[in-house]
Amino acid sequence: MKSELCSPKNQLGNCLKKIIPILLLLVLICGGCAQKDTRTVIEFASWGSKSEIDILKPILSDFEKENPEIKIDFMHIPQNYFQKIHLLFASNTAPDVIFINNLYLPIYANANLLEELTVNQNDFYPQALEALSWNGKLYAIPRDVSNLVVFYNKDLFDRKNITYPTSEWNFDDFLKTAQKLTDKNTFGVSFEEDPLFYLPYLMSNGGGILPSEIEKKGSQYGLNFYANLRKKYHVAPLKSESASATMAQMFLQQKLGMYISGRWMVPKLREEANFDWDVTQFPKGTNGSIVQLDASGWAIAKSSKHKEEAQKLVNYLASSKNSEKFATNGLIVPARKDASRSKYFLDGQKPVHSKIFLDIIE
């Protein structure tokens, strides 16, 4: 028997009457075949530069491939990060996993908003673990540990026949070097009014900025020394002399011989500096060379309904393999000991003395 479904003998109307029911049936059948996404969704919030996010996203993609039952809903918050995290906690919509630093962690931990975490402590620098703990309990697994060093323009030192600084230099050496570097076009050293940048001058002399510390002899000496870099010796720019540029910009413009900053400056210097540069430790005071150590890492919200999956993600992010990936762009000092000693951090790129960052921690 021959089919007459759409034979030339049929009229168009008759043909359509026969085809449409078949098409509708096929649509209903195919619609019922669609697979519902049953994966557990983990919300993960983080700040970060483009280069950081370019490293992070493939890691999250790999995690999903290795854990097909989990889907990551990534929230990149590049600006006003903690303001937005505050609002999410206040509205009971906090992400499962939160990238956090040691400055804000106590606020959330003290409010009982974070889950206590455990980790193999031998894998990480104790300073990073301590920075992300509150009342003796760990609330975030560290990604990085940060500290301040002295960046210096090697070409400028060479032109002025100045010996490169070493980790053994003291405050007198530091001042003399800044004076030698200073001329009508260049200042010897940077000056910033944020406590992060002047606290080392106090701490290295046995002082600090807490009310119980500020009247100490070491605190007063450190503050006076720092202020006199501008006022007395004029080896650091006055506010009016640096109004049109940041300290980082002045260093890149070779208007500063030395620049006190952290590892976060390395990618920018690698890309933009048209001169040779390196790093050394902050100079020694009466109590040695002491700078503040900070850390960032991943925390889990106590309100998370998927703590097991969130823990799996945090452990994955903090693994040796991924810690090495985070180190590749030069932005961070890994909090994992093995990653910090790997070729991915000590990679031979500038600064030549990257190990200085580790010496300060160890």
Question: What annotation goes with each model-predicted range?
Answer:
Residues 2-3, 7-10, 22-107, 164, ...:
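Conserved N-terminal structural module of periplasmic/extracytoplasmic solute-binding proteins
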Residues 61, 66, 71, 228-233, ...:
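Extracytoplasmic/periplasmic substrate-recognition and gating elements
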Residues 76-84, 103, 169-175, 237-252:
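Short helix-initiation/N-cap motifs at beta->coil->alpha
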Residues 96-99, 257-262, 278:
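Paired acidic/hydrophobic, glycine-rich loop segments that form the ligand-binding mouth/hinge
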Residues 100-149, 175, 278-280, 346-350:
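Hinge/lid segment of periplasmic solute-binding proteins
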Residues 106-112, 128-165, 191-211, 293-300, ...:
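Periplasmic solute-binding protein
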Residues 178-179, 211-240:
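Glycine-centered hinge/linker elements that transmit conformational signals in sensory
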Residues 328-362:
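Long, aromatic- and glycine/proline-rich binding clefts that accommodate carbohydrate-like moieties
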